[in-house]
Amino acid sequence: DVETMLQMLYLYFTNINKDEKSFANLIEQYKVSLKNRSLSPEKALQDSLTATLYGHNPRLKPVEVADLQHVSYDRILEMAKERTANAAAWTFTIIGNFDEATLRPLICQYIASLPSQKNIVKGKRVTFLQKGKIDNTFKRKMETPKATSFKIWFNEDMPYTLENDIRASIAGQVLSMVYLKKIREDAGAAYTCGAQATASIEDDYHLIQMLGYCPMKPEKKELALSIMEGAVKDMTQTVDADMVAKIKAVMLKQADDVAKTNGYWNGVIGVYRKYGIDTHTDYKKLVSAQTPQTISDFMKEFLKSNNYITVTMLPDESK
């Protein structure tokens, strides 16, 4: 019930306790999961992708078994207590079916009474995407030879708007359809492939990012890679009208479905509270207004940044 939820929230801030047994179990779980991590080609690709995107940022270095001995449970608890010692900068959003008259005194009892002070430390960004054109192609021994490529295009200059968010989503879905048709169906170069694009905002940083991926047949890798890159460039000139129409129909239906969930409204309220951007009211109208030309124009502007990263893992078939 709501009161139990708020009681747990209060304890989360004020009564962080040590549980040595649970911590020891967690470390053992990590040891098991990390033990054979280095043998996995998929993990090697994932690590290479992260390292290439963020310039080998030490904060994003993958955890290894040897690192676990340096994990201090006391320091973890200390950090948790530091972050919960001042509730002044926290915002609590409560969404759902509740009676305000019943809820208000509970908020006063369990949230308003949390420890707070005026000294608020603002967070700062510590990870940065590497700009320009970067290609990281490497070979890896694997039991079942296969080639896999990720291609990422991004733009940090275009503003975050609801319309840019919608256009990015449509563009990514169109690209995914094009990949499936040209790479899998027409060329027979892969069993699966796809793409997606997102727009995001965090404080004063905004990012539009498009990602294409393709686990491809090694003997057809050049063809698949060529299609992956060429399809993005082609979208600056022409975008398939039938694909756009199908995507819009799905997005409009999904809009009605997700509007019935608490998670959706939590996101809408969060963006409006932080940035004054209403992502709900005009959403369906803006989706309906998109055309192949608006998506093509979006792609032209998006690709002006010339930020394009490729990470490709090939099978090492040397003896």
Segments from the language model and where they lie:
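Glycine-centered hinge/linker elements that transmit conformational signals in sensory
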Residues: 106-121
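M16 family metallopeptidases and their MPP-like homologs
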Residues: 1-14, 26-35, 40-70, 88-95, ...
